[in-house]
Amino acid sequence: MNRAHISKYINSLLADISKLSNTLCAMNNTDIERYPDNYGMLSTDAALHSELIACKMRHLLYGSTNMKKSEYLTSAGVVQGIRISEKDGVLNIFLPRLMPRRKGRKNSEFLTDPLYFTLSQYADSHELPKFQHCVICFSHIYSKELPLSRVRDYDNLELKQLLDVIAAFVMEDDSGLLCDAYNTTELGEQDCTCISVMGKERFSEWLEERENRLKSISDF
């Protein structure tokens, strides 16, 4: 990547950052109680711009330095707070944010790339299960301090690309015949997404445990 191309790319990033700054100012001046829909639109726009900026910055880093993609994205997973654990036959993946809307590859890339390398690093020191028949549960947790109008339909969320990443590590196949998907919306202390992968025989027990400990506002 030559100097002229780098400068052009940086100017594009600066323009995106300026748009983000303007949107954040608008958010700060919007009465969230009187105009929750406007605030929701602005916050969504700001979040998408932030993801776009992060992804563009990654590509600039890869193209203009000697930083390896795998090294950077492993660090990005740590910074984002992605956590992976296993307990009682359930693989749990914690994402400290809500799932992106279906708005294009870059919005998903912000999350899926670090997740892939975080799973890869975890697999280096842990023996991951390989499920033949499984259930993958997406728990979409919204901060109880913010308006319920923020809750989104599952059909508008980008789940398929995330499922493909997880499937590469723990599933023999993510087809409908071998994998059932379950979504739940809950209230919590902060926005986040918890993904639980388990054998079908474990699902009913997991669901009962979840209902006993979490306050749910809707299930699907």
Each predicted region: which residue ranges?
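Short acidic, S/G/P-rich loop/turn micro-motifs used as interaction or catalytic elements
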Residues: M99-R102, S143-P147, R202
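N-terminal targeting/trafficking signals and adjacent low-complexity tails
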Residues: M1-N66, E71, A76-Q80, E86-V90
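Short glycine/proline-enriched loop/turn "hinge" motifs that connect secondary-structure elements
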Residues: R83-K87, E127-Q132, L187
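Long, charged, low-complexity intrinsically disordered regions
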Residues: D88-V90, G104-E109
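C-terminal edge-of-domain segments
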Residues: S175-D219
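Short amphipathic
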Residues: R83-M99, C137-Y142
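Short, hydrophobic/π-rich interface segment
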Residues: S143-E186
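An N-terminal amphipathic alpha-helical segment
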Residues: N107-C137, K144-E145
